[in-house]
C-alpha cells in the first residue's frame, strides 16, 4: 500500500487557484514519500488525469467554477473499480459543499488554512486506507445542514459490538486506538469495521459516520459516547 514500507504516495492537485496549487506542491514536494504527479484547474480534467497518472490521493477544491469537487468525486467513486482517496479542500469548515462531497464519497476534508504538517499527515493518513475525520466538524456539518437519511442504519443488523466500534470510529479513533479502548486485538477491530461498512453499504469510515449521524444512531448535537 502507498505510504507503507517506504512506498511513495502519488498525489493529484485540483484547484482553480494557481497560487493554492503552488503552495500545496511546495509543501508536499518537501517530503520524500510524497510525489505530486500532476495538477488540474477544474474537475472536468480529473477523470482523465486519474486514469493516466493513477494517483493514490486526490487533493481537490470543493468549489470550482465549471465541474466542482462534488461532481468530480462522485464520478471517480462511481466509475472506477479502485478510485483514489479524495480529500476535499475548503475555506470554511461548515461549508455545505463539503457535506455533499462526503456523501459523494470523499474520504475527508481539509481547511485551506491547515498547517503544512497537518496537510502532510492528512495525505499519509488517507493513503494508509484510513479516513480523515474531524468528529466535531462532521457533527457541525450535519447539524448545520439539517439533513437526515433516516433509514441509513435501519435494518442494517449491526451487533452491539459493531455499534460500539462505529461510535469509536465517529470519535475519530484509528483501528489501533479502538483496539486499545476495547482491549481486543487489532485484527478483531478490523473485522468489526469491515462488517460495519459492509452492512451499511459504506465505501469507507467517513460514509459510515455520516450515515450514523444522519440516521440518528449518533446525535449530531452531542459528541458520540
Model-derived segments and spans:
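Acidic catalytic/metal-coordinating carboxylates
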Residues: 42-45, 66-72
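Short, flexible helix-to-coil linker/hinge segments that flank and couple to helix-turn-helix
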Residues: 96-103, 108, 112-164, 214-220
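Short amphipathic alpha-helix used as the core "switch/output" element in two-component signaling
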Residues: 48, 70-82
Amino acid at each position: 500500500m502507498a505510504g507503507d514500507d517506504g512506498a511513495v504516495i502519488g498525489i493529484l492537485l485540483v484547484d482553480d487557484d494557481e497560487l493554492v496549487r503552488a503552495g500545496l506542491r511546495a509543501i508536499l514536494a518537501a517530503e520524500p514519500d510524497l510525489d505530486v504527479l500532476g495538477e488540474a484547474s477544474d474537475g472536468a480534467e480529473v477523470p482523465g488525469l486519474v486514469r493516466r497518472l493513477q494517483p493514490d490521493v486526490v487533493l481537490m477544491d470543493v468549489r470550482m467554477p465549471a465541474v466542482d469537487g462534488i461532481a468530480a468525486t462522485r464520478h471517480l467513486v462511481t466509475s472506477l473499480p479502485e478510485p483514489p482517496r479524495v480529500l476535499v479542500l475548503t475555506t470554511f469548515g461548515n461549508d455545505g459543499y463539503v457535506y455533499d462531497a462526503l456523501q459523494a464519497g470523499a474520504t475527508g476534508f481539509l481547511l485551506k488554512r491547515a498547517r503544512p504538517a497537518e496537510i502532510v499527515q492528512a495525505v499519509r493518513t488517507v493513503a494508509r486506507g484510513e479516513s480523515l475525520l474531524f468528529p466535531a466538524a462532521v457533527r457541525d456539518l450535519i447539524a448545520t445542514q439539517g439533513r437526515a437519511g433516516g433509514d441509513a442504519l435501519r435494518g442494517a443488523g449491526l451487533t452491539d459490538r459493531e455499534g460500539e466500534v462505529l461510535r469509536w470510529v465517529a470519535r475519530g479513533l484509528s483501528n489501533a486506538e479502538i483496539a486499545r479502548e476495547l482491549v481486543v486485538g487489532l485484527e478483531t477491530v478490523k473485522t468489526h469495521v469491515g462488517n460495519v461498512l459492509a452492512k451499511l453499504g459504506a465505501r469507507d469510515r467517513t460514509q459510515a459516520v455520516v450515515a450514523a449521524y444522519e440516521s440518528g444512531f449518533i446525535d449530531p448535537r452531542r459528541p458520540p459516547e
